[in-house]
Each structure stands twice: as C-alpha cells, then as structure tokens.
Amino acid sequence: YSPLDALRIARENPDREVVFFAIGFETTAPSTALTLKRAKAEGIPNFTCMCNHVTIVPPLRALLDSPDLRLDGFIGPGHVATVVGARPFQFIPADYGRPVVISGFEPVDLLQSVQMILRQLREGRCEVENQYSRVVPHEGNLRALEVMAEVFALRPHFEWRGLGFISQSALRLSDAYADFDAEVRYSVPGVRVADPKACQCGEVLKGVIKPWECKVFGSACTPEHAIGTCMVSPEGACAAYYNYGRFAREREVV
C-alpha cells in the first residue's frame, strides 16, 4: 500500500529491478517524494519510479474554462487540501465567480458543506470557505510542499481522460532524481490511448449531463466493467450514482 513497501522489496531483492507506479493528486505525492529521498539517501540503484502524479488546479481551470460548464459551486477536495491548503482554490471565486467549500468526508461534513454552498448562492456571496478546518490549514502542509518541490517538477502537458491535454497538470521527477526516473532509465515512449467514443465522462464532470444520462451508464459501463474514469474510481460520480442513486433520476434545480 505504501511506496515504502516497494522500496523494501527493492532493498530485499538487489538482483531485480523494482518500479513503483506513482499515481494520485497532491494527496499521495508527498509519500512518493519521501520514498525517493530515502532511496537516494540509501543508494538503492534497482529502485525507480514511474511518476503519474497529477495536480488539482489545472484541471479545475480547464473545467471552468469550458463554455458548456453547468456547475454552480464546488465541494473542495479535503484530502488534497490537507496538503495544498485552502489558498490555491481562491482563483475559483476570484476569476470565475463560483463558491468553494472545502469539505471533510463524514456524512455530516458533506451535508454541512452543501448547506454552506447553498447559503453562499442564496446570499449572493462567492468565496472559499473551509468546513474541514480541523484538518486543513489555509497554507497547507508546508513540509510536504517543500519535499514535493525538491523531488518533482511540472510536466509541460499531460493528457486527461475526458478532458484532453492540460498544460502543467502533472508531475515528473526533477533532474536531481533522474537516476530514479523509470521513464529515463527505460526510455518509456509516449503512448496515447483514445477515449472510448461512447464514454461521456467529460460531460459528467462539467455537469452537462447526469451520470444516468450517459448512453452506456449501467449497461456497457458498470463498476465491474468500467469504460470511463467516472466509473472506474469508487469516488467517481458515475460509480456513486450506480451504487447509491440509480433510481433517483430527476434533475433538481436550485
């Protein structure tokens, strides 16, 4: 589960090459960064990292720049905010006029966050509020951000399922850690995988359609046989609708 497990496997098997596939937003990037720092400090040559960490702000901007966006507000990701803080989300109300509430994960957290967004909309306010203040500091986890800045660098661009190429939306290993970069060591070619034509995850993410309005929802696309990213992840909107809301198929207007 931990990248340190991959490092341990490399340490215990010096005759084998071990590649850790690093994924996730800023939530998981610090643990990868600390693992790479340890690998460098211990001099473990058979350990490398295939870095596919992504960043939260560029895809949010891409969504907000979409001309067909139909989202009135954002429940901010509490897990990402524990690392980056509340400050990076200020551009949403400042530049796009939409409220943001950073939320915890308990049912009462989510309910309160929705209430806070609705209150902002009702009162004509537009700001970043931090419902998850018991965990999320405004400036984030400074130590984690410092380690990430040392180990990672921004990629020029990165391709997202349903959203296409987004500039500087993902991380690679910095030059100081090139010896542990699997892309460098193994000359990994760039591979493009086209989005399935029937998949409408992009429209779901932008609020253009509800998950159950997708042509393949619940038939060709299920959690067991997912076509799109919104169904692959248990946190995805389509997976949530499939598991908990398949029969609530009426649009609600606020």
What positions do the PLM features span?
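Short, solvent-exposed amphipathic alpha-helical segments in soluble enzyme
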Residues: L34-A41, L64-D68, F89-D95, M116-Q120, ...
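Extended hydrophobic packing segments that form well-structured cores
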Residues: D181-V254
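A conserved active-site cap/scaffold subdomain adjacent to cofactor or substrate pockets
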Residues: M50, D68-P137
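Short gly/pro/ser/thr-enriched loop/turn and capping motifs at secondary-structure boundaries
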Residues: A6-L7, E26-A29, T55-P59, A81-V83, ...
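The feature marks the mature, well-folded catalytic cores of soluble enzymes
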Residues: Y1-N13
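Active-site histidine-anchored catalytic micro-motif
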Residues: E12-N13, E17-A22, T27-P77
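Internal helical hairpin/lid segments
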Residues: L111-E203
